[in-house]
Amino acid sequence: MSFRSSPQGKPHPMTDYQSIRPSEVEQLFEKKFHYQKPKGNKSWQLPPPDQALFSEFYQFEALQGLREQLNAVKSKLNDYGVQEWSAHTNRRDPSGEVSWRLKNDTKAEFVTVAWCKLFECLHRYPLVTKPAVNSMHLCEAPGAFIASLNHYLHSKYEKDEIKWRWRSTTLNPYYEGNAINQMISDDRFIVHTLDNWFFHKDLTGNLLDVANIDHLVERCEVEFQGQVDLVTADGSIDCAAQPDCQEEIVVRLFFAEVLSALRILSSGGNFLVKMFTLFEACSVSLLYTLNCIFEEVHIFKPATSKRGNSEVYVICLNYNKDHPDLPRLLEEIKSKLAQPNDTLVMPLFAKFQIPHDFLMQHEIACRMYMKLQTDAIEGSIYAYESNDRHYLRHLHHLRSLVANTYYSLYKVKPLEDSLCIVDKEATSKALGFQVPVYGGSYTERESLKHGDLLKQIYCLRREFNQLEKCLNNRTPYSYVKNRTAPLNLHISRGAPVQSLQSSMFASEPILILRLRILDTFELDPVWQSAPKCQLESKTLCYLPPTEDEAFHTAQQRFFIDLLEEVKKLKPDSIVFHKFLFLTHYAASLLLFLIESVYQDCCFNSNQAQTLTLSKLKDTANSALEQVLELLKDEQAGAIHSLLDIKELQKNQFSKALIQHNNSIVMTCFRSMLGEESFPMPVAPTSNSDVGSIQESAAVF
């Protein structure tokens, strides 16, 4: 039996489940749209200088009608559990076998769904037309576009022909001020290619800051001598909390990506940017802009893009950088982006400035992609509710056909290991543990958000219990000193971390639960352990920042005090009690103390949760003086780390530190979420009059 789509998008059985019409596979690979530009005097033009930009707010009624239709279908998913629904759509994804085969049969480098999608785009459009190419990749983490482009180049050209230089930027996973739920923290590719990544002067990697766009332009001028042939932009923002407002939420990011690309791309260059629904007038004006300054603009939804989501790739070919009206346009966009509170939902152009024939074509494109998405959602609902075994058999056959078509159409072949950018073993290591937490449906999450505190605590406890099952806290951990060369300082500076939002020195599920507890109780679990450092006769308490202080200020103050006391008292040992080293600043100072100041270190994973450094070195004083001088002078920018990132990541030291931090944070969770506990703020204590203080008992 085969299937055909009903008007509602539900598959109806026909006569033979095993027969699949060629059009069913073809439809997956042909979700394309090409804007047809008029020629001559009727060609689409940017508004002249005497016409204002961002001058009025309006919407297009027909497009808003399409938006309402799409949201009506998407709202049918409100009562499905997010994990359960995601697992269901993954099983139903007809392209699901493609990435599996690329990983396991072809053994391609760093395969993700993004890898598969870019590989399609490169084969379907002339984004790269010669073996000598300079490419810039925006919002690129974890790096799959780069690995995919490398595979494409080596599949199409001989090794000796290829002259490829690439650089990339993304939200910096090593900068603790970047929110963990707004960035990709997978650094398996990044850590081995750090010299190719721009995180800008503030180290955030945040393209929404126009100063970082300026820095990006400067760096590209130096690195590529102004010749950038290809720019890709794969950014997005999590819109799970407001699924009906995705387009408005991401519009600032789109403008930042487009502004960056148009400033760094060379004349004749190509641009690929991921977008979502295109119903809003601000998106219409952005697409019209791209059509005015590129020879060709296409919209493409790859076969490996999940059918039920809104993502599409806008592909722009042959950039006209010398367009006379372009500089004013870029300056206006930059000015708008420089205002953090400006949502940029105001359309770039007035309504009369957008030609009717462009709007007609744009509406056709929007209708097509909206219909594809609603059909996919309706089909998924039907499959979920019916549990039709014959349909599942049909789907299994379809997945195999789609994978075969992908391999045949794009001439997929394996590459020699020597042609990979990073050693495959390094990028194939597991990211960590996954926690099977029930996320609930959208309706349940909304109800919980506005529900009573006890329900929220119950959900947090349930998540904590799942975390405890996944973590093995009884495994001992240690750091064995085996360094043959001295530890070299390598100072990195950037914007001070205002609040601790992420860390590479604790497991991601733990950090996410910490943020949820913080949202619920408005108390930060990381301070609930009352961290302190014992220097034989003296104790230093690590105090949280005051209301008006940055997190960086608090950590800077503590570590300067600590190093001053070690220098003055020369204690033969120091003991950190329930002390979290979650930032590169703290971790680099710890490694400095271990390697340059003390001879021995011992992680104690029992209930005390201590870290002891002992046997003060004879050369400690000079090392301490050098580092103290650096810590006190931040005129050139706040210190992010004293050591090279590679000294602190993906090694025995980082593994021990992650286990140490995980153990302490879990203890804090246990105290805050226990049956008899209710969180209470820690009373601040001054270090000035502390000689020796007792363990704080009831801080919860």
Curated annotation (Swiss-Prot):
Q: What happens when the gene is disrupted?
A: Ganglionic branches migrate normally along the intersegmental nerve, but sporadically fail to switch to the segmental nerve and enter the CNS; they wind up meandering along the ventral epidermis instead.
Q: What induces it?
A: Induced by the branchless FGF pathway in migrating tracheal cells, resulting of the switch from the intersegmental to the segmental nerve.
Q: Which UniProt keywords apply?
A: Methyltransferase, mRNA capping, mRNA processing, Nucleus, S-adenosyl-L-methionine, Transferase
Which species? Answer: Drosophila melanogaster (Fruit fly)
**Catalytic activity entry:** a 5'-end (N(7)-methyl 5'-triphosphoguanosine)-(2'-O-methyl-ribonucleoside)-(ribonucleotide) in mRNA + S-adenosyl-L-methionine = a 5'-end (N(7)-methyl 5'-triphosphoguanosine)-(2'-O-methyl-ribonucleoside)-(2'-O-methyl-ribonucleotide) in mRNA + S-adenosyl-L-homocysteine + H(+)
In short, the EC number is 2.1.1.296
- What Pfam families does UniProt report for this protein, alphabetically? FtsJ (PF01728)
Adrift-type SAM-dependent 2'-O-MTase domain spans which residues? 109-321
Asked if the Swiss-Prot or TrEMBL record annotates the protein with the keyword Coiled coil, the reply is no
What protein am I looking at? Cap-specific mRNA (nucleoside-2'-O-)-methyltransferase 2
Instruction: Supply one GO molecular-function term.
Output: mRNA (nucleoside-2'-O-)-methyltransferase activity
> What are its GO biological-process terms?
7-methylguanosine mRNA capping; methylation; open tracheal system development; positive regulation of intracellular mRNA localization
Q: Which GO terms describe its cellular component?
A: cytoplasm; nucleus
What is the stated purpose of this protein?
Probable S-adenosyl-L-methionine-dependent methyltransferase that mediates mRNA cap2 2'-O-ribose methylation to the 5'-cap structure of mRNAs. May methylate the ribose of the second nucleotide of a m(7)GpppG-capped mRNA (cap0) to produce m(7)GpppRmpNm (cap2). Regulates expression of tracheal genes required for pathfinding on the segmental nerve.
Where is this protein localized, as stated in its record? Answer: Nucleus
Chain intervals for the UniProt region annotation (Disordered)? 1-21
Q: Where is the active site?
A: K117, D234, K274
Annotated InterPro entries = Adrift-typ_MeTrfase, mRNA_Cap_2O-Ribose_MeTrfase, RNA_MeTrfase_FtsJ_dom, SAM-dependent_MTases_sf
Per UniProt, where does S-adenosyl-L-methionine bind? Answer: G143, W164, D234
User: According to the UniProt entry, where is the signal peptide?
Assistant: none
